[in-house]
Amino acid sequence: LLSGKRTTVTLDGNEAAAYVAHATNEVAAIYPITPSSPMGEWADQWTSEKRPNIWGAIPDVTEMQSEAGASGAYHGALQAGSLATTFTASQGLLLMIPNMYKIAGELNSTVMHVSARTLAAHALSIFGDHADVMAVRSTGWALLASASVQEIMDMALIAQAATLEGRVPILHFFDGFRTSHEVAKVEALSYDDMRSMIDDDLVKAHRDRALNPDNPFIRGTAQNPDTFFQSMESRNPYYFAMADTVQKAMDRFARVVGRKYHLFDYVGAPDAERVIVAMGSGAEVAQECVEHLVAQGEKVGLVKIRLYRPFRADLFLNALPA
């Protein structure tokens, strides 16, 4: 995997995400929670085995006392100019919300990987839905979905490239257990692929924004409403441009690796009268069904949603058959 040659490997979704995250970051602040635990465990194991990232450095992996602590360390690492990541789900993601607002507000480039899981209400459930991801829609993070193990590996790298350029943090998510623990045969990205996708000038720009006593500036102040309002508005152009930035990263990935993705992908009859809109693992099943029905002459189709936030309604409508 560490060579320049692409290989076919058998792994699950968690390992696929952790593989790219460990290779393209320098710090991982973790606290395991089902079903995301293996991502942190893989990262911890690879660091203990002295596996380098794509720059030849050994990433620092630190387990904190809770997800709240993990997100605080994660935020701090980003402020120090490190390329940092974390992995979580469900209640763990909820504990990260305060720092997620800070990370997005400061326009930090980063990718967090989430194996989406039900939130505890009248009872706890470790199984999968998107309740946790839906709870963080207002934090200012981009939300990017993967539907299969191959997509997890691909989207993890696409997200890393896009966030460095767009400066909007990305929450990359996939269905807990159904995809996080699905074992599949995939084409593993090589370190050369990752180096081709990551722009070192953008990495340097991220480092240059770090808090540094040799280049002091103020951040994290208390502001009155007039100033606060203007600062909030000044972030919007980054958010509005992020969808195009993600598509640009997808296009670059297609040139480097060969697999093509779009923010919304349509499969099915060009004259479909009935269309399913799906995000996550269900899209895989729906696609097989659609292809089977279309072969029998049915006018049906499927729109697969990849970038859920920012949601580009115009591109969604363009993806639908005319």
Regions found by a protein language model. Give the residues of each.
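Thiamine diphosphate
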Residues: 1-135, 140, 157, 177, 251-322
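Short, solvent-exposed amphipathic alpha-helical segments in soluble enzyme
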Residues: 44-47, 101-104, 160-162, 187-190, ...
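Conserved thiamine diphosphate
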Residues: 126-176, 200-201
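Short helix/loop capping segments that flank catalytic or ligand/cofactor-binding pockets
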Residues: 96, 122, 181-183, 285-287
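Conformationally flexible catalytic loops at phosphate/diphosphate-handling active centers
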Residues: 55, 170-265
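Glycine-rich beta-alpha junction loops
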Residues: 117-118, 174-181, 280-282
